[in-house]
Every structure is written in C-alpha cells, then in structure tokens.
Amino acid sequence: METKYLRINPADNVAVAIVNLPAGEHLSVDGIEITLNEDIPAGHKFALKNFAEGENVIKYGYPIGHARMAKKQGDWMNETNIKTNLAGLLDYTYNPIQVSLDIPHKDLTFKGYRRKNGDVGVRNEIWIIPTVGCVNGIIGQLAEGLRRETEGKGVDAIVAFPHNYGCSQLGDDHENTKKILRDMVLHPNAGAVLVVGLGCENNQPDVFREFLGEFDEDRVKFMVTQKVGDEYEEGMEILRDLYAKASKDERTDVPLSELRVGLKCGGSDGFSGITANPLLGMFSDFLIAQGGTSVLTEVPEMFGAETILMNRCKNEELFEQTVHLINDFKEYFLSHGEPVGENPSPGNKAGGISTLEEKALGCTQKCGKSYVSGVMPYGERLQKKGLNLLSAPGNHLVAATTLAASGCHMVLFTTGRGTPFGTFVPTMKISTNSTLAKNKPGWIDFNAGVIVENEPMEKTCERFIDYIIKVASGEFVNNEKKGYREIAIFKTGVTL
C-alpha cells in the first residue's frame, strides 16, 4: 500500500504529504479524519487541526514557527502562512540528557593509505595549492601538464585548487585563508602537495611554510614563481619528483574507527528530515560507536534546534562552547542588519520547508543522537573522536570546504533539489527522494528516498555502510568522476 502522508511525531499538528495529494482527498491520520482543502505537493505540510492566528505549528515534536493567520484543518501550511519564532541572542541553560545507544561493535575495515605521521587517507592524490590567487593560471597548467604526462595513472587524481585570496586581506580573513590552506596541505588524502606562491603576497610563502608546523618535507614542496625563471618547467620538475614518490603508495587495511566524515545538507526539501538526514544520523551514531568521527557544521542552520545539541554536550564546558558557537553566528548576522531567521532559500520553500526552525530540526538529524564530544572554531583541525560541532556558515562551498579542512576524509551531502558541487575530498550526494535520484544519476550517489517507499531505515543504513566502506576504499563518487573539485574560504572583512 502506497504511503501518502507522514506524521513524524505524535505531538505534531501538521503532517507531510509523501506524494502529491489532491484537494478533496479524505485521509485518516492517527484517528483524525481530514479532508484536504487544497492540493498538497509532495514534501509539503497540511494542517491536522484548526489554527488560531499566532498559534505554534509543531513538526518533529517542536515548534517550527506560528500561524500568521487563522487556518483550517486540511489547509496547506507553507511559508505564506507560517512565520518564524526566531529572534536575536538568547540565554541558555544546560539541561544535560543521558544518551544510551545500543549499537554493536563490528570489526569493519576499509582500504586506506597510512601516512608517515600515522594518519590515514582514503585517497592518494597530488594537489597543487596556491598561496595567492595571482598564480591560479599557473597551477592549472601544471596540473594539466602532469595529468598529460602520466595519463592520470599511478595516483587517484592530480588537482589544482584555485582561490581568490592570499593577498589584499587583513585580520580574520587573512588568518582564515592561511588556516584552510594549511589544513589542505596537511590533509592525508594528499599523497603529495606542491605549494605555489607569487612572492609579494600577504600570505608570504616562507611565513606560510612555518605556519604549517610539522610536515613531511619529502611530500610537500614549495615554489615561489618570482624567484624562478620558467615557472612551468620548474614546477613540472618538482611535480615529477612528487609523482615518483606518491605513485608508490599502496592501500592497506584500516579499522573503521579511523574514518572521519563531514555531515552536510544543501538544496533541502520536505523529505530531508524524513529520509536522508535521519539516515546520516543513524550512520553517524554507528560510526561513533565503532570509534569513528563525524562533524556537523552549518551553524545558522542549527538556529531553532540548538538546545537539542546543547543538552547532548558531554560536559558544561562543551555546552558553553556551543552557546558561543551559536551566539557568535547570531551576532554576525545582527552586525550586518540581517534577521537570524532569514534562511530558507527559494528551493527550500518550493520543496516544503517554511522556516529556519523547520530546516534546523531536519538539518540536525544528520548527527544522530550521540553525545557532542568537541566544538571547533573555523579552520581548526580535528582533535577529538566522536561527534564534533564546527563553526562555518551554511553556504555549500564554504561549509563543505571547512569540513574537509577539519580533516574529514569525505563529506556526506544530503540534498532534495540536487547539486553537482564537490570539494577537495569525495563529496557524496545522498538524495532525499527517488525522483531526484532518477533524474540526476550523474549527481546522486545514493538514494535515501526508498525509506518512504517501504524499505526499512535499518536496511537502507546497512547498504549505506557498505557503500561508505567502498568509497573509503577507493570507489569514486560522481563529483570525482566528473572532476568537480573546488574550494571556498569564508570571508567577513574588507578587501584592500
């Protein structure tokens, strides 16, 4: 029997249409008899009761806003008649909850690359990273030259990562650029790195070299283009040497406890919080139970669900760090005169998401139910296993880059609308609905839409775990197959 609707939580006073529902259709929702007053698109909400103006709309068991006007049972509930409850900064109280997850330990492994410092990568690639955007053209030619000479064999990829920064920046922007580039140079998915500088930039190559801290000097080389004659020939000579070393690396068995994944959503729809995001949450809990690590970011998309995360913090110090994480981003919004609740995009709204609270309550399901073990500033590298919260905006390119820079081996990216984007680590797209998976097979790597088509979540998660292990062991995802590899760095200040 086809599932036509879903009431996610018994406390909800709206339900979600799983398929397009016509006006006049009669439904029985948990004993509530309803006749729809309007057509309800799939992924959208309809009222289970009459609403008075100002009355809270409940989904996932929490308020997602309030009714802008009186609405009748069976009405379509969307952004035109639901308004956010979010305001400015809030005071929070630590009300810790007990987390008890009965997840068995399994001796699972993947095939990864063990690096000289003991870290593990899931790819063995050669990266060309510029200290400044002025040399973007050069690094592109160098990457193409080495790919042509090697015919793309011997390593997983040879990639140049252009960006616009490294000069004309001050303060936090300059530091953020240095941090993200440092994190890339030190990332274990790179078997070798050539750092290319100009020579006169703010991000001075010699200073940046010191900023890296300890690194493998056999696998990380520098070239300052103002100090060499023919930068192409010089760069190719260095790259040939790096390739000779990296191409000898081999995969070996690595316990799943060493896997680190970033949790991301984008182009969300009304199914995100029902299918793909809960799937990631179940996987995240499983990975953490095996001793692994997951990272949640997109701080503005936590607004409205932040107390759920705060109360899962292992201790009060982490709680205070999470409060700072949330309020720091709210202050960023307010300092620019922007309301903190102005988030859902046109695509979100078309897909059935009406307010930021609704988006947040779906978004935060990606991190499951585990304790919060760490809270990280922007650009910092992972120090703690388990579930970590990371400071970054919701922007796809910036957030995914930040997750990868923290040390995540791959980014798990749920989407209801679809996106081809990939960052500098494998960026796996998980569709929230089967229509998207069918229409965009060149973008979507895994379809979570089957969860509302009567495949149990547990079975879907078992398949998902198997697929994650295959990807960690070398199977390419679509963004890698197509060469969609980009980085974006968070900018908040002036440009000189």
Put a short name on every predicted segment:
Residues M1-M410, R417-L496:
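Metallocofactor- and cofactor-centric catalytic cores in central/energy metabolism, strongly enriched
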